[in-house]
C-alpha cells in the first residue's frame, strides 16, 4: 500500500497499522511530503518486489479545490509513467451521507482520474446510500464496495439485489 495522504494528521500511521494487521508492506512518505513522490516510490517498490497489487491511499479532497484536483491529476499521471497502463483501477470513496453532492463530486473526479467504480462508506449510519442509483444511472459508474464501519470485515462487495431488498424492507417496516 502507498500512504500518499501526507497532509491529514495520523493518516500515515493509520495506514501503517492496517498494513501491520494485514501483513502488507506500506510505503509511506513524511508529513507534508509531495504525494506524487510517495506514489513513485511505492510503484518502484512494488516492481522491485514483484507485487501485483498496489493500493494507493490519497488525501480526501473537495472537487471545488482546483489545486487539489490538479494534484490528483499529477498523481494519476506519475503512476502511469512508473507502471505502463496504470492505474488499472481507480475507485472513488464517497461518504453515504454526502447525498446528491456525491454526483457532482464523482463527475468531476471522473474527468480528472477516470474512475472505474465507487466505494460507498458509512452505510451503517442513517443514510441508505440513495446516491447509488443516481451515480449508476447518471454517470454509469458501478458501486464496487460498501462500508458499514471501520473493522476489517466491515467492507463488503456491493450486491445490488441485497441493497434493493434492504431499501424495500425498510420501506415496508415503516408502513
For each feature predicted by the language model, list its residue ranges.
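P-loop/Walker A NTP-binding module and the surrounding RecA-like catalytic core of P-loop NTPases
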Residues: 1-175
